[in-house]
Amino acid sequence: MLRRKPSNASEKEPTQKKKLSLQRSSSFKDFAKSKPSSPVVSEKEFNLDDNIPEDDSGVPTPEDAGKSGKKLGKKWRAVISRTMNRKMGKMMVKALSEEMADTLEEGSASPTSPDYSLDSPGPEKMALAFSEQEEHELPVLSRQASTGSELCSPSPGSGSFGEEPPAPQYTGPFCGRARVHTDFTPSPYDHDSLKLQKGDVIQIIEKPPVGTWLGLLNGKVGSFKFIYVDVLPEEAVGHARPSRRQSKGKRPKPKTLHELLERIGLEEHTSTLLLNGYQTLEDFKELRETHLNELNIMDPQHRAKLLTAAELLLDYDTGSEEAEEGAESSQEPVAHTVSEPKVDIPRDSGCFEGSESGRDDAELAGTEEQLQGLSLAGAP
């Protein structure tokens, strides 16, 4: 009886094994085989302008199994790049079509419609459509930007909202003047300090005890340090003020503290001053900056007005006293001239006595000369 010899796959001939491995590699598209990278292929991977024919399926046939793996890898890379390009193009066109849906005409076919298939125009036509949509979108964006700029930028005739109307210039009162002896340039971030130049004259508005004063220079109100200035004496100006007031015929001196505060528009501080001992104008003349700090009057304009009023009141009183003294001194010579006839009588007699004694001395001198002449004549 004949027995069949068992077959073993491992005992096959080498030629059969080689053919079997070749068939397997061609059936599985040779994915496991390493592909050499080419710089030319990498540059064309995601190029939308790459023209690949539509009828080329890219699937290798059994006749191409004997060709080199390099050519097979290039074909598969081209197929993959074409598929990716189409997917990316679909996504970009879909996004643009959604944005431009309101502006496009009705009835225009959308690339994302169900009629769109793989047989649609190639990458070149898709790139052309994409560029046309970009050109169509640019004018819309430019119009939107122009309208936005027109809304944001004000017209030449209308005033801008950011600019504030200029504040009125401060006109007083002032509590003194000071001349700058040292140049000082403030920081560009410090908008409250004054730029000082040697020789400038500052009108002082307030002199707080901390050392940073408030003044007016070149039409600008700002702060400055007292170490850069020398305070100018105000005595001459203070004495001249009453005369100017009298010459101009202004209102006379107030009689009460309440009347004074009404004139300078600070009636609100009347009760504060009265409760702290400033009940008369004589008391108000002694008002100083330290007293204002004790009274908790911190408004710079109110402080300047009160201090200026106190100084003017003091100057007014001192000027009136000096005027009275001058009037008295001018009246004294008149009194002396009236009393001169009574007082000059004994003085005249005294003068006569002096003249007689002088006359006697002259006579004695004459007699002595005569005696000398006689003695000379009698000599041999």
Curated annotation (Swiss-Prot):
SMART domains found in the cross-reference section: SAM (SM00454), SH3 (SM00326)
A family per Pfam: SAM_1
Outcome, altering residue 347 to C: In IMD102; decreased protein abundance; patient T cells show decreased proliferation and cell cycle progression and increased apoptosis; functional signaling defects of the T cell receptor
Compositionally biased residues, Basic residues: 241-255
Any single GO BP term: positive regulation of interleukin-10 production
Protein name, per record: SAM and SH3 domain-containing protein 3
Lineage: Eukaryota, Metazoa, Chordata, Craniata, Vertebrata
Residues with PTM Phosphoserine: 27, 34, 42, 97, 110, 113, 120, 320
Bias-annotated ranges (Low complexity): 22-41, 153-164
Region feature (Disordered): 1-76, 98-174, 237-256, 318-380
Domain SAM, chain residue ranges per copy: 252-316
Domain SH3, chain residue ranges per copy: 173-234
UniProt modified residues of type Phosphothreonine: 61, 103, 112, 318
Task performed by this protein: May function as a signaling adapter protein in lymphocytes.
Naturally occurring in which organism (per UniProt): Homo sapiens
Gene Ontology cellular-component terms listed: cytoplasm; nucleus
Keywords for this protein: Disease variant, Phosphoprotein, SH3 domain
CDD domains: SH3_SASH3 (cd11968)
Record-listed Phosphotyrosine modification sites: 116
Acidic residues composition-biased segments: 318-327
Gene3D superfamilies (UniProt xref): SH3 Domains (2.30.30.40), Transcription Factor, Ets-1 (1.10.150.50)
This protein's encoding gene: SASH3
Implicated disorder: Immunodeficiency 102: An X-linked recessive disorder characterized by recurrent sinopulmonary, cutaneous and mucosal infections, and refractory autoimmune cytopenias that appear in early childhood. Affected individuals have bacterial, viral, and fungal infections, as well as hemolytic anemia, thrombocytopenia, lymphopenia, and decreased NK cells. The disorder may also manifest as a hyperinflammatory state with immune dysregulation.
